[in-house]
Amino acid sequence: MNRYYSNNQEITVSLIPRTERAAFLITPTSYGKSVLGAPLLYFPAQVESNSRGLILAGTHGDETASIAGLSCALRSLPAECLKHDVILSMNPDANQLGTRANANQVDLNRAFPTQNWTEHGTVYRWSSHTPVRDVKVKTGDKEQLEPEVDALISLIELRRPKFVVSFHEPLAFVDDPAHSDLAKWLGKQFNLPIVDDVDYETPGSFGTWCNERQLPCITVELPPISADLTIEKHLDAFIALLQHDPDL
């Protein structure tokens, strides 16, 4: 049994028994292919709703806790309760290779065709304890998008979500300059503070691309956490998100 609050109403849902959670009850749909030819998959919402959103993880292949958390939530929730489209990973090649960037060494979260996109590459932090961000990766080509980026844009244009929640690690906050009700709800569910930005430049980011199109995008940064502990601590929050009906 899962209980949570949505728009100040208590919602109770009978979950799939744990013994039956190995398989997905919803068949994913392909929306493209990665650089190495892996299918890009999304799980379509099963509830007709004017507030259907997109829940996204796996932009960086080495950020796996939210992928596991979302997957377990999908397999725990009865299919007919899924209110939002879900992408467990938009970067499957990097998941397989254990890298942040895709198979072309492009950071997908710096490769969206935004006004502030730069061709000069970017850097990231090797680990949470590394004092500087100095590992070099590419930012792609604004005129010839990475297949993972191009496919996601096409899917959003097709499905027209009302909002996006994008999961990352390991900064431990909810990033939403608007401090929206949805961001506050997410902060409460995942026990994370809300911030205005990540405190460094992010040219070509997915969030910027969404903002330029007036598509609300909230980034949830989980703390440095294992997949196992994510499931233990945050499964209820992921399950609640998949059913949440935000007041947009």
From Swiss-Prot:
Q: Which GO terms describe its cellular component?
A: cytoplasm
Per UniProt, subunit arrangement is: Homodimer.
What family is it from? Belongs to the peptidase M14 family.
Q: Which HAMAP family match?
A: MpaA_carboxypeptidase (MF_02211)
Q: What is this protein called?
A: Murein peptide amidase A
Give the EC number(s) under which this enzyme is classified: 3.4.17.-
Write out the coiled-coil annotation as residue ranges: none
